[in-house]
């Protein structure tokens, strides 16, 4: 089933028993986090909170708290296991879009043309008088404090926008970028845009600042998009395909877009049926910036983007289960807020796994498998454990063909997708090891690994800025473990043979099992 907007999805979830309305008063300050966290850990439903005390907007939480709801958002109505299989089908679609196979026959050529036509047919379309602009706040009416922005953890620096789809465009680019970056509230119309240097929004901003020094950079933030658009923003979409176009493929209908209303921001388009849209700019710094507070990291310098207004962001509790360090990021000044009548505020929290991003990670793991297999046919399975923050550790199952093969796969995974540049640990095992069973993985490590021979250490590599274990912010080491059976050339010893029971004996005991009544 496909959903034209968030409300359509909410209605479907409620009919399936996958959404619960909470009528009791619940505060966005800490209480929503605690309630959503308990429900998520129990595998419970999405929660639609009545407008909290002193606020006019209901809050939607825990929307993608199970793999099934992620699959439902992508248009697949199935149980968790079947849903994960459907996500692999999605990965195969993405791998075909990323790197199409040369046709070997007229039939193959026809399939390739059909795929290209499907993508072309899903180009977004512009509409006028969109629902997302039914109500408009501008001038003195712009006040982000009127929104029920969550404060997630006791040590957080303040309220935090968590599910905002940030829309940007680089200079001379027709394709808009959608990214999800947390945004700290620091004033009635100001948010800190925490995008890391390698993310699409930050790259667009830096390119703009280089080519247009001193000019405000337009940004839009969408709160409460339809599920296909939201999930498109977190999926590894090929650079040649826009997230809006990919959302159309998921939905089976073209994404309807509306131009923003603010002059200068009207170069950007947002989902026409979004609940709330923030429009504004990142402005150049006026005058000399105030000195950094004592003990804070130095202000950014040395590039064109550093000449824009920045503020010290954090600390915040994040997906690692810790509070992160403070860092400087650009300030987004909101000049206009548009919304639907009776708008719904979509929110989440991040914390020690499992949390909603970890559940999304489990789902996206299935999307990654066909993408990796297209490039590395020897990979038979791939797993990003949620306990490893869904990206910091990868377990790879492979069909080994020669000595040193596992090490080749390690470096291949690290370099293949941007999503894996922050993966600190890779463990490679053979096909006989179930990589989703820690008992089997630990057995393989402890019986097939010699620490000196089978450990690969790589220093001075890109590392997540939130990883305080690295000696330098953003730069650290990686480790690979070759837990495969060793081939000639890798060992001079006779390699162990796994113990297996005789098949005839197992069949005999199967029959006895029933007779004995065990």
Swiss-Prot record:
It is found in: Cell membrane. Its EC number is 4.1.1.98. Mn(2+) binds at residues 177, 243. It catalyses: a 4-hydroxy-3-(all-trans-polyprenyl)benzoate + H(+) = a 2-(all-trans-polyprenyl)phenol + CO2. It is a peripheral membrane protein. The active site is at residue 318. GO terms for biological process: ubiquinone biosynthetic process. Pathway: Cofactor biosynthesis; ubiquinone biosynthesis. Catalyzes the decarboxylation of 3-octaprenyl-4-hydroxy benzoate to 2-octaprenylphenol, an intermediate step in ubiquinone biosynthesis. Belongs to the UbiD family. This is 3-octaprenyl-4-hydroxybenzoate carboxy-lyase. It comes from Burkholderia orbicola (strain AU 1054). The lineage of its organism: Bacteria, Pseudomonadati, Pseudomonadota, Betaproteobacteria, Burkholderiales.
């Amino acid at each position: 089933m496909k959903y034209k907007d968030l409300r359509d999805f909410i209605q479907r979830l409620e009919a399936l028993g996958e959404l619960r309305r909470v009528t009791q008063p619940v505060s966005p300050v800490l209480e929503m986090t605690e309630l959503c966290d308990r429900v998520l850990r129990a595998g419970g439903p999405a929660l639609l909170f009545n407008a909290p005390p002193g606020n006019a907007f209901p809050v939607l939480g825990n929307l993608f708290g199970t793999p099934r709801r992620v699959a439902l958002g992508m248009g697949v109505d199935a149980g968790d296991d079947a849903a994960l299989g459907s996500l692999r089908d999605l990965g195969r679609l993405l791998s075909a879009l990323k790197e199409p196979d040369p046709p070997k026959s007229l039939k193959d050529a026809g399939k390739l043309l059909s795929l290209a036509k499907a993508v072309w047919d899903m180009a977004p379309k512009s509409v006028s008088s969109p629902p997302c602009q039914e109500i408009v706040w501008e001038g003195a009416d712009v006040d982000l404090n009127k929104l029920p922005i969550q404060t997630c953890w006791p040590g957080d620096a303040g309220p935090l926008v968590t599910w905002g789809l940030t829309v940007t465009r680089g200079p001379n680019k027709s394709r808009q970028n959608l990214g999800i970056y947390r945004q700290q509230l620091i004033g009635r119309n100001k948010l800190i845009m925490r995008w890391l240097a390698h993310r699409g929004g930050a790259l667009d901003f830096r390119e703009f600042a280089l080519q247009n020094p001193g000019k405000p950079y337009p940004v839009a933030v969408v709160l409460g998009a339809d599920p296909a658009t939201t999930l498109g923003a977190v999926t590894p979409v090929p650079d040649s395909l826009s997230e809006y176009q990919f959302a159309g493929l998921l939905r089976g209908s073209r994404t309807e877009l509306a131009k923003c209303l603010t002059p200068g921001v009207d170069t950007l388009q947002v989902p026409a049926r979004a609940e709330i849209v923030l429009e504004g700019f990142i402005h150049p710094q006026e005058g000399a910036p105030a000195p950094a507070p004592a003990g804070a990291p130095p202000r950014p310098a040395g590039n064109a983007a550093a000449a824009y207004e920045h503020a010290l962001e954090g600390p915040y509790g994040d997906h690692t289960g810790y509070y992160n360090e403070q860092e400087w990021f650009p300030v987004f000044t909101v000049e206009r807020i548009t919304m639907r009548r009776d708008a719904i505020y979509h929110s989440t929290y991040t914390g020690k796994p499992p949390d909603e991003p970890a559940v999304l990670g489990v789902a996206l793991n299935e999307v990654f498998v066909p993408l990796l297999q297209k490039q590395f046919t020897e990979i038979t399975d791939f797993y990003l454990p949620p306990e490893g923050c869904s990206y910091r550790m990868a377990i790879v199952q492979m069909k080994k063909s020669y000595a040193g093969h596992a090490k080749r796969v390690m470096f291949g995974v690290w370099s293949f997708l941007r999503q894996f540049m922050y993966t600190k640990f890779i463990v490679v095992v053979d096909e006989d090891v179930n990589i989703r069973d820690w008992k089997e993985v630990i057995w393989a490590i402890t019986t097939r690994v010699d620490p000196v021979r089978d450990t690969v250490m790589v220093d001075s590599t890109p590392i997540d800025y939130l990883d305080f274990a690295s000696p330098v912010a953003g730069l650290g080491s990686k480790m690979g473990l070759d837990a495969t059976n060793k081939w000639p050339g890798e060992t001079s010893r006779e390699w162990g043979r796994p113990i297996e029971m005789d098949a005839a004996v197992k069949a005999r005991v199967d029959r006895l099992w029933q007779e004995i009544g065990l």
